[in-house]
Amino acid sequence: MKKYLILFLVPLTLISQEDALVEEVIVVGTKASLIAAIDKQRESDKIVSIVDSDALGDFPDTTAAEAIRRLSGISIENDQGEGRYVSIRGLSSDLNSIAINGALMPAPEGNRSVLLDGLPTELLDSIEVSKSLTPDQDADSIGGRIDFKTKRPTDLTGELIKIKIDTQYNEQAKSNDNPRFAITYGDKLSDTFGHVLGFTYSSKQIVSYNNETGFGWETNSEGLKELNDDWEMRYYDLTRERLGFTYDANFLTSDVTSIYISAFHNEYIDDELRYKDEYGKLGSIGTTTQSSMFTDRIRHDAETRVREETRTISAFNIGGETIINDWNSEFQLSYSFAEQDDTDNADLTFRCEVRAKKDSCVNLKSPLVSGAVGEINFSNPRKLVLNSYYPEIYDPANLKFKELELEDSIIEDSETALKLDFSKDIEVGGNPAVAKFGLKYRSREVDVDKNKSFYEDDRTMADFNPSQLSWPFPGQVFSQQANPALVYALQNQTDSLTLDGQETYLEDYKTTEDIFAVYGMLTSDLENGVLTYGVRVEKMDMSSSAFDQDGNPTKASSDHTFVAPSINYKHFINENTLLRTAYSRSLSRPSFNSTAPVLELEITGEDIKGKYGNPDLDPYESDNFDISIEYYGNNLSYLSVGAFLKKIDNAIYKTIQKTATINGVSFNDGVETWINAED
């Protein structure tokens, strides 16, 4: 199938100055923005990569993650073709820290990974990725630190108006009403005041078809691969809307004192319809070849999910700079907030299962063909083909109402921080240097409130006006699916259904994390280089509360102190070539989900399984070594070669015990938790 993607871009930048007679229309190309990024990278005293200014809009990037991936050592994890999580040097996104204008971004999922697919590039002026750390940066950055910055009024020379409008056409989508526009207005109203306002809106429809086989592949006694778990075919039809604004203002109150404010707000709405055809409990019998197998069981689930998820990220800063007794003094008070709202989610599953010599949803033929109910061909493991000997499993009248799941969940993550920095020009060994010290206090709170209700009914899919989807992969059968409007309406019809269970507190928890940090550092200009070194100390106190299986509150707490020395050296080999070396210690704290004292249960007959959090987890700790050579040639040519080594202790991973007793609950079918590797 041919696919077409067409983009229409209409950028316009107007800049006027007070002494100009007419307005100028200035087109700033990739060259100008590339010069700015390379200059900043070259002048930095640590190892960084930078995307600057209009380069963010030169490509059809939808999200901030997609803009970052153009930098060396950066990869991203996509969702529905859009960049979502960022990996620095191949490490988990949980091991990064991300900030907007200096305010650390929270993560509205209960972990440390920050979702970036809701953050549009139009709101940003530059992105800086730090791969080595200095003591004035937060230590929780084993992977690295990503700083997003909006346009500052101090960069203005006059009035600025920037407008961008684009759209796209995609043959896969049902609708091509995909507008995206952004406007930036700024003005330096006087020698003492300037401000910048930005606004952006976009809407994009995405349609996708995929096959998923999970981790069900095993090697049998003959050394052949076979699928012994499940396989899914999925269809997505979703619309993603992004709305955001920024406001920055700068006040010069005297020759040595300035105050600034910064506000950032972004809202992301994901309106999703998902059809899923799942074939589970597949068991190999009889002949298995390199490309196929017989199965004595097929569990066919047809699922319709209608969901609208809203994510919000906000950051607010007020700060200033002045001189006190020859010390340049800076302060910043920041508040950041993230929320994930899943209060509009309906998921309905229908099931028809056939099993050899056991109860089935359809009458089995007698005798069975080789004791099998079907055959699976996996000559193409990315696109399996099921030959069911019982096509009745696709009949809506045989697909019985299995379960309706309604979710009403909200996750909130917020952080308040205050930092003070003091620096002064001095001499060390006859060389100019800058002494700097400071302190920072951060208080973070994560509040998870998940509510799920499960319902049963005696109807079949035939009662939900099913329809057949056009499936693009030859040989595969995608069954009919329930009408999504009727599924969505069930949220207001629960009185006519049978309540099968509720989860109102089992996954709920609240965690508070307080971090106090102090640091000292020195930056010395040497004859052929720059040396930056110092130490940072961070003390963390964490407290968390949840509920046990009876609804009684449980509490847990932990604390630790971390010492983080670092040294960065930039050596000038010649006018165009730099050698950089760096050493630092850093950490990454466990996810909130893994440390909260949450005990989740799943009871099936006499079998009890579940998972629980481990408040005693230690953070990842890492010794980081870096070396790189950078060449800056003429005509914007740039070349760098680097290597790094990270020695990471206290790695965190999941473990499963077959039996265990926790908080009075005896598990006999497996219990999952998190532990440190040294344990």
Where are these regions (language model features)?
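Outer membrane beta-barrel strand-and-loop segments of large Gram-negative receptors
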Residues: N614, D618, Y638-D679
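Transmembrane beta-barrel wall of Gram-negative outer-membrane proteins
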Residues: K174-K281, D301, E309-G319, N325, ...
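N-terminal periplasmic accessory domains that precede
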Residues: A64-A67, R84-S87, A99, L115, ...
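Structural signature of Gram-negative outer-membrane beta-barrels, strongest in the C-terminal barrel
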Residues: L252-V256, S262-A263, N317, S334-S336, ...
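Short acidic/polar hinge/loop motifs at secondary-structure boundaries
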Residues: A103-K131, I183
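Extracytoplasmic beta-strand/coil segments of soluble accessory domains associated
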Residues: A65-L104
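Flexible glycine-rich, low-complexity coil/linker segments exposed to the extracellular/periplasmic environment
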Residues: S291-I298, K358-E403, D449-D508, K658-I675
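N-terminal periplasmic "start-of-domain" segments of outer-membrane beta-barrel proteins
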Residues: I26-G57, Y85, S93-N96, A103
